């Protein structure tokens, strides 16, 4: 009888977005929730690096799909506006190409973007862009319910849920085609194919191997991108503070050494200090390969298969700077493309090396659509994609120097000069990410989304081990801040369903939130 009356105890391992959201939702429902995190602050991959006395966002920098958090917070009696200061971005990103003087802005206004493409390329390409937008809209509408909101989608359930009209949409897309091939059907200008092919990297993947369905990422951005005052770290900080107000017991600077089981189900976690936290339920918000490789105990090797190194998603080489810039008129989000795009992904996924000529993403965090008012040092994040082999090798100084020099040279050829002192840049490499996120090998997006079946290979929130649930970017529905938040909602809802606190139909509503329609 005591077990029935006892408030269910939950330990959430990892204070990334998925863990913060699941802890908050469960605490709001009255469960006894303890959150443990090895870092000394919340956020997981949302992290700030201190450079010259200022914090530089050095993880995710784009805030999209705000409806995921909007609906969750509405259920808690608050709103995003109550906990964050958001500003919509008009210029989604500014793009430049090596060897070309022209730039292209993607804008929140689709018609204005079409006008920009007509000037940059041709009126025919502008019309093709508008057709592309219509297809990505239909694709998103088709996949939102049967895939994004589903706790564990599979091919059979998706076919059933899609119905004839949904299947017609997928068939028209060519679901077995790669993203690169499909984009070649939409655009004749290779620069536009390159621009939209970059959306594969949002899932840590190559556009030559990713499925055509990843075109829906374009729709996500076109619906809206926001900047967060104080940086993306404020998202994690606000959710952590709200969780504690609802009763979450957060413990930072504490590592989970092992997840214990008893009689085949979860019984608690052991901390690195040796302390044991008893719990009937554990939500693991980390890279699931840590479970499969035995880093948290041998009990889970049969339930979780670690991602093999060649199946891992992208890692990164990042440079967090406080520096003066000149020349190129940067906005908040900027992309500098190389000439041989395919060679970049061959270097990373096949030759397993830092790209000789990699695309460079630059987040100028003190800028908005109109740029920087005064020529003063600004917070800059430069990111180059890299192979996720951080657990088996470390790049040597000459490799790092070559990649950095090539990246700066590419930006210089596009017109951007960065004047940075050596002590005002912090570099993070795949080996550093492998240390920050155990079991990942430095992969930042879990398993690469390669092949048309890859979307069904991510673990779901409910594991085969009773009482153990998973959340985060390495599980369904995938990487990125909104998807990780969705995974946290799915994990919390699945746990509550197993406790009999909600029905399956209620779980769909709770985890799903509002449509983008």
Regions found by a protein language model. Name each.
Residues 1-41, 46, 118, 124, ...:
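Structural core of flavin- and non-heme-iron oxidoreductases
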Residues 1-10, 28-29, 450-454, 503-517:
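Extreme N-terminal leader/targeting segments of oxidoreductases
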Residues 4-142, 447:
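N-terminal glycine-rich phosphate/pyrophosphate-binding loop and immediately adjacent elements
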Residues 60, 473-495:
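A conserved FAD-binding loop/helix module that cradles the flavin
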Residues 137-246, 253, 436, 440-449:
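Active-site/ligand-binding neighborhood in enzyme catalytic cores
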Residues 189-203, 357-361, 417-477:
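A glycine-rich dinucleotide-binding beta-alpha-beta segment and adjacent secondary-structure elements
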Residues 227, 257-374, 511-512:
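Mid-domain catalytic core of redox enzymes
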Residues 324-434:
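C-terminal segments that line or cap access tunnels to active or ligand-binding sites in enzymes
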């Amino acid at each position: 009888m005591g077990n029935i009356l006892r408030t269910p105890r939950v330990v959430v391992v990892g204070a990334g977005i998925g863990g913060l959201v699941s802890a908050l939702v469960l605490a709001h429902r009255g469960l006894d929730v303890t959150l443990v995190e090895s870092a000394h602050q919340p956020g997981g991959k949302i992290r700030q690096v201190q450079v010259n006395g200022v914090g530089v966002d050095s993880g995710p920098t784009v805030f999209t799909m705000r409806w995921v958090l909007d609906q969750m917070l509405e259920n808690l009696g608050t709103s995003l506006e109550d906990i964050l200061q958001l500003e919509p971005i008009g210029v989604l990103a500014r793009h430049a190409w090596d060897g070309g003087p022209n730039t292209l802005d993607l804008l929140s206004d689709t018609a204005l973007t079409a006008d920009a493409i007509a000037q940059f390329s041709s009126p025919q390409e502008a019309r093709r862009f508008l057709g592309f937008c219509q297809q990505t809209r239909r694709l998103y509408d088709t996949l939102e319910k049967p895939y994004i909101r589903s706790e564990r989608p599979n091919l059979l359930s998706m076919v059933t849920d899609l119905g004839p009209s949904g299947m017609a949409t997928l068939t028209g897309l060519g679901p077995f085609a790669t993203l690169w091939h499909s984009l070649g059907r939409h655009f004749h200008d290779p620069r536009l194919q390159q621009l939209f092919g970059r959306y594969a990297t949002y899932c840590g993947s190559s556009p030559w191997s990713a499925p055509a369905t990843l075109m829906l990422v374009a729709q996500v951005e076109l619906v809206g991108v926001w900047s967060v005052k104080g940086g993306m770290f404020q998202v994690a900080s606000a959710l952590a503070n709200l969780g504690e107000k609802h009763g979450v017991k957060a413990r930072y600077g504490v590592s989970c050494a092992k997840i214990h089981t008893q009689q085949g189900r979860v019984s608690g976690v052991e901390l690195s200090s040796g302390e044991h936290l008893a719990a009937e339920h554990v939500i693991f918000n980390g890279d699931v390969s840590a479970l499969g490789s035995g880093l948290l105990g041998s009990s889970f090797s049969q339930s979780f298969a670690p991602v093999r190194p060649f199946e891992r998603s992208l890692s990164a080489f990042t440079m967090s700077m406080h520096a003066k810039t000149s020349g190129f008129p940067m906005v908040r989000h900027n992309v500098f493309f190389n000439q041989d795009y395919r060679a970049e992904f061959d270097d990373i996924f096949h030759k397993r090396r830092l790209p000789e000529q990699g695309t460079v993403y630059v987040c100028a965090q003190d800028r908005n659509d109109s740029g920087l008012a005064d020529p003063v040092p600004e917070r800059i994040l430069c990111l180059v994609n890299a192979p996720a082999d951080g657990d088996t090798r470390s790049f040597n100084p000459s490799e790092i120097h070559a990649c950095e020099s090539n990246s700066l040279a590419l930006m210089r050829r596009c017109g951007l000069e960065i004047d940075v002192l050596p002590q005002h840049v912090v570099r993070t490499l795949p080996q550093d990410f492998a240390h920050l996120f155990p079991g990942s090998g430095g992969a930042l997006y879990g398993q690469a989304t390669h092949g048309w079946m890859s979307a069904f290979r991510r673990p779901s929130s409910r594991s085969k081990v009773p009482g153990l649930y998973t959340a985060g970017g390495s599980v369904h529905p995938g990487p990125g801040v909104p998807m990780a938040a969705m995974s946290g909602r799915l994990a919390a809802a699945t746990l509550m369903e197993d406790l009999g606190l909600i029905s399956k139909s209620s779980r769909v509503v709770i985890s799903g939130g509002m449509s983008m329609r």
